[in-house]
């Protein structure tokens, strides 16, 4: 989303985004009540946010532990052929998130597995491509943080004289 598009979002749009991120199952009538708009007005605003790609989807958040995935881990993957890594990620259902990154590693993958043997099997697939390093996630402190439009404060320009002082 560009800063120009950010400028077009008003306080109602921001509240709509906050409410839907907290509970995407709200009816349009209830959402309208919460943001002080009529149901047709809020429906139109949500439609525009979807059309602009700001709202990119709705999903259920599941508890991976309750689904049988007792271990979550991060796999850092070194340099390897991009297409081969992408293909392997797509073929690995245990891969919850995959990030192509800068720095020492080229990829950071988040995986969910049943146990240590399952972890070893998944990591071994990526070891065939390149070197890896694995960290088991002990505790999740923050996840699925709701985000609102970026609001960077304007930076004050300092004169060269004030910098030298």
Regions found by a protein language model. Name each.
Residues 1-165:
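A compositional/biophysical signature of low hydrophobicity enriched in polar/charged and small residues
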């Amino acid at each position: 989303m560009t800063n120009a598009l950010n400028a077009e979002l008003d306080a109602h749009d921001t509240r709509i985004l906050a409410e839907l991120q907290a509970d995407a199952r709200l009816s349009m009538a209830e959402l309208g009540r919460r943001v002080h708009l009529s149901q047709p007005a809020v429906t139109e605003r949500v439609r525009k946010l979807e059309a602009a790609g700001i709202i990119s989807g709705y999903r259920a958040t599941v508890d991976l532990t309750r689904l049988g995935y007792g271990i979550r881990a991060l796999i850092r993957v070194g340099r390897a052929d991009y297409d081969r890594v992408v293909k392997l990620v797509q073929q690995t259902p245990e891969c919850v998130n995959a990030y192509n990154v800068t720095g020492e590693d080229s990829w950071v993958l988040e995986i969910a597995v049943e146990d240590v043997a399952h972890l070893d099997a998944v990591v071994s697939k990526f070891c065939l491509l390149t070197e890896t390093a694995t960290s088991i996630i002990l505790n999740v402190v923050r996840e699925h943080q709701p985000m609102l439009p970026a609001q960077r404060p304007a930076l004050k320009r300092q004169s060269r004289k004030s910098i030298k002082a």
